[in-house]
Amino acid sequence: KAAFQKAASEALESVTSDKNASRYANDIAIVTGVSPNSIAAQVVEGLLAGGATVVATSHSFKPSIKAWAKQAYREHATGNAKLWLVPANLSSYRDVDALVDWVGHEQKKTSGATTTILKPAWEPTLFFPFAAPPVHGTLADSGDLFESQARLMLWGVERAIAGFSHIGADTNVQHKLHVVLPGSPNRGVFGGDGAYGEVKSAFDAIVNRARAE
């Protein structure tokens, strides 16, 4: 009887009593470059397990992406965790700006006299810019190829950081955006990987900018 009572008690216990299940409960996290079995996907799953509201972006809305999102939420979400899957081509500055605008503004739907709030305006607290293309090319290929890779992995990231960090700045001076950059010790050591090494080196400059600007 005691065993059954213990099992019933554990079943009724709120997940919010688990510290790990609520460690990100107050966070709005943006994770870019999500695809099944990717590092970004694992980050999303960890955030959901901590109760975060997560905006995950993918350049593709293939059935496999949607299936992953449903499974990730079903298996990992705790408490009031939410997962929004948003299409975005982050090598396009227009898409970067549109994503920032969408996150920072309330989204409504009006039907006749009824207005429904689809999502509130958010002030993101965590940003994981993991979107990246397949990288290839030697120094002899520098030019358009390197530029397209750097646009997604570096310049688009800088633009997004600037956009997200300014959301709510006029009304909440204490608000901070924590950015987790996907760094690497590979600074051109392997060769043949396009603009990868240059981009990873440039992340050091972004960190310095955070202190200086």
Give, region by region, the residue ranges found by the protein language model.
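Conserved Rossmann-fold cofactor-binding substructure of NAD(P)-dependent oxidoreductases
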Residues: 89-119
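Catalytic loop of short-chain dehydrogenase/reductase
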Residues: 20, 131-213
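Rossmann-fold cofactor-recognition segment
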Residues: 72-94, 98
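Glycine/serine-rich phosphate-binding loop and adjoining beta1-alpha1 elements at the start
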Residues: 1-15
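N-terminal Rossmann-fold cofactor-binding loop
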Residues: 57-62, 90
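Glycine-rich phosphate-binding loop and adjoining beta1-alpha1-beta2 segment
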Residues: 60-78
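Rossmann-fold scaffold of SDR-type NAD(P)-dependent oxidoreductases
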Residues: 32, 87, 111-134, 181
